[in-house]
Amino acid sequence: MKKKLIIFSSIAIISIILFIILAAIVNNDITVPLKIDTSVRDFFYDIRGNKGDFLYYFNRILTELASKYAVIIIGIIIIILTKLDNKAISYAIGALLMILINYVLKDIYQRERPVEALRWIIETDYSFPSGHATSSGFMFMFLAYFLYDSNYKKVIKIIGYVLCGILVIFVPMTRLIFGVHYITDIVGGLLNGIFAASISIILMIIFKEFKIFDKPILVSLYEYIKRDKQEGNKGPEGEEKSE
């Protein structure tokens, strides 16, 4: 337990420090994109092809894997798999933290998105940090640890790790292809997502060690309802009521 806590606490601290440094650089002149932002933006504009071709529709699907709906769906799946145990509780806390951080930071920095004429999709909120990148960093890091801490077969875990590794890179990249974010928005979002995932994993480790929410809440609720129903069917002396 101690080793894991040190590892993920370190990851959380490092991600915060790196974000603070990045945010300071971006905020130095929030109205002017950095050179790396314009260079990466122009690169993706050159390779993305035309709106309406295969790459466009493929990325429309891919980008939804980090939408708010995806965060909710993953949460529901985790609840179903765990029957609402400490893993599901940890995910919910991390997801709420992620949403709060992203909302507050966007409002603080108020960075405008890239040129509207070159965007492939409509986005109305601020640019820094990227919400989709934040969701990607959070979900795919959490899911990787969820697999690590599970009893699934090794081959399933390996496939899951590979998929998480691929998606955490390519899903945020769709935001560059659509022209709605700069690369620094993406990096900032990933750092925030990694921080939120680290907090979730730390909570999961602590909950598991001290047996907090150890018994799935849905199982406990079912047993309580069943027991209450059985007691309700008994008479005053503990005998079953006759129909």
Regions found by a protein language model. Give the residues of each.
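N-terminal transmembrane-helix/juxtamembrane module of multi-pass inner/ER membrane proteins
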Residues: 1-68, 108-120
